């Protein structure tokens, strides 16, 4: 069983990244429950190396897709995502959304004919993952219309991933005295979630 971890924990805190701590809590519990899982990680460095698609790149990718050349390197991220049995995405809550590097990654995995396709009744997902978990943290409290959460929920529908779950560690910069307790609570939620999947 292949577990894909998309690590977009870009942070000035380095190893003290709060989003990464949330991810560690989830992954530890998940791997304890599923010791057979093969963990594959897309690192922050790999994400930052991805280029956003310009017109030339889009035309090249479309030409490759039409010829069925999905083994080309431009589809590497999409193939990896499509073949994962479970996906964890971790990214901080930046500017009411998430880091730009994650949006570029989404461009790379959104490949018609590989991660989804069209039929007369609309779009159908082609990814084999049964669930995707989105982990995020932010200085502000969670809002009902948090873009990161909404976007990944919609992407799961696009990719045919039936179950979407998330943990939002929020309010971390409101009162520094409360931050440790808030993080502890969020990590406990992530741990508990992993035990149910």
Q: Where in the sequence are the language-model features?
A:
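Short, glycine-/small-residue-rich phosphate/pyrophosphate-handling segment
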Residues: 118-161
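Glycine-rich phosphate/pyrophosphate-binding loop and the adjoining helix
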Residues: 143-197
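A conditional alpha-helix N-cap/helix-loop micro-motif detector
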Residues: 67-70, 114, 183
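Cofactor-binding loop segments of dinucleotide-utilizing enzymes, especially the Rossmann-like FAD-
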Residues: 8, 44, 136-137, 169
